[in-house]
Amino acid sequence: MTSLTLALDAMGGDHGPHVTVPAALRALKSHSSLKIILVGDKTEIDVYLRQAEQPLLSRIEVIHTDEVVSMSDRPVHALRTRKNSSMRLSIELVRDGRAAACVSAGNTGALMAMAKVLLKTLPGVDRPALVSCLPSVTQKPVYLLDLGANISCDSETLFQFAVMGSVLCEAVDKKSRPKVALLNVGTEEIKGNDQVQQAAQILQNTDQINYTGFIEGDEIYLGNVDVIVCDGFVGNITLKTSEGIAKLLVHQLKRGLTQGFFVRFLAKLIAPRIQAVLSQMNPDHYNGASLIGLRGIVVKSHGNADETAYLQAISLAVTEAQRRLPEMIKDRLESILLDINN
């Protein structure tokens, strides 16, 4: 790939440089043309760079700051007062063109507020959306948005989310005409509130979006559609509930496989298969939520992500930057609006 630079908020998340720096080094090993700017406390960062190979160090830059956005900071407070924080400086690197994308595991609300103010939304986009992919029984990812950036949305905003989600799926998975659905309380045309009903009407009349209709919550993981659209209130609860169920299933499976000698013996025989199933259910395997609809790329990692999970978020940022995701969304929106106006 051509040379690409990412900005990492090295201090963000529960583990800070203990996770972000080793993950950055692993990303550099995987992508020979990648450069990374680590933003944070240089003293702490250097601890994890001491044993790194020189060829990797030559592709790392450290920008020092000892200011951090805490998980308890309110978004408005962080925006007004944390002007030299590792999170803000990372986003500013994207704004100023020094980095193609930013990755942070820090305070989600603060990240969204800073990104929206510093990067601005694309033409035709009223609000950015937070989107991530979920597993499915067909082994293909399903994209769900919005995950909490916008608690309530009107029909036009839901329509914009559908367009952005469709373009994201095309860009990341190289999927032609992804299937898009609206999350609803039923699949019948009469079901749903006014916002969902009106969004459905707009999508039905938009040829450039492969809209398939409504989808219910029990169909999310079947893999029958590629993109599922809802407001941030519904999306966030759906995501958190899904993660909780995954943890419950993993716990119950592990508990069941340790009860009794014969069961433990069988568990050892099928251990590789069990591990593969557990891996598919692990939310860390799908770590990385994209804040789309902005003039730059911002990827949010889980705050408690380990090194491998954080690496997944970095890889997502690399892919979106390579595909020039903001430009793709901008072009598609312009094309759709042109069709509607004609």
Curated annotation (Swiss-Prot):
S-S pairs: none
Subcellular location: Cytoplasm
GO cellular component: cytoplasm
GO biological process: fatty acid biosynthetic process; phospholipid biosynthetic process
PANTHER family: FATTY ACID/PHOSPHOLIPID SYNTHESIS PROTEIN PLSX, PHOSPHATE ACYLTRANSFERASE
Pathway of action: Lipid metabolism; phospholipid metabolism
Family label: Belongs to the PlsX family.
Cytoplasm in keyword set: yes
Pfam families, alphabetized: FA_synthesis
EC number(s) given by UniProt: 2.3.1.274
Predominant cellular place of this UniProt entry's protein: cytoplasm
Function text: Catalyzes the reversible formation of acyl-phosphate (acyl-PO(4)) from acyl-[acyl-carrier-protein] (acyl-ACP). This enzyme utilizes acyl-ACP as fatty acyl donor, but not acyl-CoA.
Keyword Ligase set for record: no
Keywords: Cytoplasm, Lipid biosynthesis, Lipid metabolism, Phospholipid biosynthesis, Phospholipid metabolism, Transferase
Catalytic activity reported: a fatty acyl-[ACP] + phosphate = an acyl phosphate + holo-[ACP]
Subunit structure comment from the entry: Homodimer. Probably interacts with PlsY.
Name of this protein: Phosphate acyltransferase
GO molecular-function terms, A-Z: phosphate:acyl-[acyl carrier protein] acyltransferase activity
Gene3D superfamilies: Isopropylmalate Dehydrogenase (3.40.718.10)
